[in-house]
UniProtKB/Swiss-Prot annotation:
Name of this chain's protein: Exosome complex component Rrp42
Record bears the keyword DNA repair: no
CDD domains in alphabetical order: RNase_PH_archRRP42
Domain of life from the UniProt record: Archaea
GO MF terms held by the record: mRNA 3'-UTR AU-rich region binding
Origin species: Thermococcus kodakarensis (strain ATCC BAA-918 / JCM 12380 / KOD1) (Pyrococcus kodakaraensis (strain KOD1))
Length: 272
């Protein structure tokens, strides 16, 4: 066994022993989040943006909007696409190059939470049905990895969307010309989905795992809900299994914590 494996085993034993005593390595209770800070409109040239700090984790989310064609099977809907960049300076485990499986999973979970909750009214992004729609790009940049990138990124994405303003557009049906006006309107956001992530370590389940907890967790579960209680995304990670009663417990906590975080997001964007 290598020195690194020995240290990981010692850390796991220490964390599990603390959990048996009802404690976490950073002093939080099992259902406590780390300190959460949200700032919006932090990228001047983006249509919307947000910076999120969750404990030692930092993410920056920018929103860009372009005009383009709709998907052939959804001619009366605008388009949303989510991309994630794991900045190499954020973690020794991040490498430059194309997105790896972690970045792809992160982008998919964030995208699914927004898309399946119908957070953005895609019908209102249509300029000409079947021909011209707004294409919204959600770009997530992980600046510092201190654990629980899923929640930090999802919170940053919805905060950035809520801060987004789009230039009004005039379309001339006779000439087919498009005029971009110097007038702006808010992106139509109808729901505020919030992801809540749990780590299973031994027989204990904790919310918002730190990086130390992620390194020793047996399983991970992320549940995204909106203000109506609708579940828009769920993602399981790692090999460990969750019992049905553990999933139901996680759902109950996800709804409660989602409401608490949602209030902070709305306050940050001036909609509280």
């Amino acid at each position: 066994m290598s020195e690194m494996e020995v240290m990981a085993s010692i850390m796991r034993d220490h964390i599990i022993e603390l959990l048996r005593e009802g404690k976490r390595i950073d002093g939080r209770s099992f259902e406590d989040y780390r300190d959460l800070e949200i700032k919006v409109n932090v990228i001047e040239k983006a249509e919307g943006s947000a910076w999120v700090r969750l404990g030692d984790t930092q993410v920056l989310v920018g929103i860009k909007a372009e005009l383009g064609e709709p998907f052939p099977d959804l001619p009366d809907r605008g388009v949303i696409t989510t991309n994630v960049e794991l900045v190499p300076l954020a973690s020794p485990t991040f490498e430059p190059g194309p997105p790896d499986e972690n970045a792809i999973e992160l982008a998919r979970v964030v995208d699914r939470g927004i898309r399946e909750s119908q957070a953005v009214d895609l019908e209102k992004l249509v300029i000409v049905p079947g021909k011209l729609v707004r294409v919204i790009f959600i770009d997530v940049h992980v600046l510092d990895h201190g654990g629980n990138l899923l929640d930090a990124s999802g919170i940053g994405a919805i905060a950035a969307l809520l801060s987004t303003k789009l230039p009004k557009v005039n379309y001339n049906e006779e000439t087919g010309e498009v005029e971009i006006l110097d007038e702006y309107e808010p992106l139509p956001v109808n729901h505020v989905p919030i992801p809540v992530t749990f780590a299973k370590i031994g027989n204990s389940i904790v919310v918002d795992p730190s990086l130390d907890e992620e390194r020793v967790m047996d399983g991970r579960l992320t549940i995204t809900t909106d203000e109506t209680g609708h579940i828009s995304a769920a993602q399981k990670g790692e090999a460990g299994a969750f019992k049905m009663e553990e999933v139901m417990y996680a759902l109950e906590v996800a709804l409660k914590k989602g409401n608490e975080i949602r209030e902070k997001v709305l306050k940050a964007v001036g909609r509280a």
